[in-house]
């Protein structure tokens, strides 16, 4: 049986751990609120660009752009959003596991795909496994600005336009609630379904394009694709903080339960020690009579 000193030491260390997990839970909750606001505020911008691009695509005008055209797939690009830090439950592991299973099903060789990774945890794991990392970005702030990922977003789109990739996907955790994050694969390029946007049919007649539709498309399509990458990052950040808040809440609850259990064990051990001392005193007194 553990001594009173050992039990007391475990209680003290568990209380310190509980203080840390509680603090991390509160910090994550505050960051989650800001991340949700950022993601929700950016959505109208992406929606409006999509509406204009879809209106042009469905206007009947003869337009063409590499980002709208399907071609035989020789190489696929995966933009993967993970976190730099752990202690977020299954936030990273679920995403990475799903991606690895998808890669195994779709590709026979590393020459058939490339990974553009955001986040230290994903970067380290992919390097350890020897997967083909084309580009990486780590150390992103908790509230990222577009400039933080502008280079990697622009490079990703250019690699598709230049024919290095024939299709491009974004993998991230979509925020549903603090306790639920859905692993999401979004096909970024080519934008083959954008002309079917229902809003575009009614909106197409309300736009006049200067100098012409093709010139507008040349400008907007790369911006739209880059905005989708940034929007996915904002969504993933909200998911990360929600997952970490939930994980730290569970850790805090577990610490509380352990402290209660250890306290009960400590009280029983102390009671047994006191009883033993009383028994020894009574026994000693009886022996003196």
Curated annotation (Swiss-Prot):
Pfam families recorded: ATP-synt (PF00231)
Function: Produces ATP from ADP in the presence of a proton gradient across the membrane. The gamma chain is believed to be important in regulating ATPase activity and the flow of protons through the CF(0) complex.
Gene Ontology biological process terms in this record: proton motive force-driven plasma membrane ATP synthesis
Principal location class: membrane
A molecular function GO annotation: proton-transporting ATP synthase activity, rotational mechanism
Location(s) in or outside the cell: Cell membrane
Gene name tied to this protein: atpG
Protein name per Swiss-Prot or TrEMBL: ATP synthase gamma chain
Family: Belongs to the ATPase gamma chain family.
Domain of life: Bacteria
Record keywords: ATP synthesis, Cell membrane, CF(1), Hydrogen ion transport, Ion transport, Membrane, Transport
Species for this entry: Alkalihalophilus pseudofirmus (strain ATCC BAA-2126 / JCM 17055 / OF4) (Bacillus pseudofirmus)
Membrane topology, as annotated: Peripheral membrane protein
Quaternary assembly: F-type ATPases have 2 components, CF(1) - the catalytic core - and CF(0) - the membrane proton channel. CF(1) has five subunits: alpha(3), beta(3), gamma(1), delta(1), epsilon(1). CF(0) has three main subunits: a, b and c.
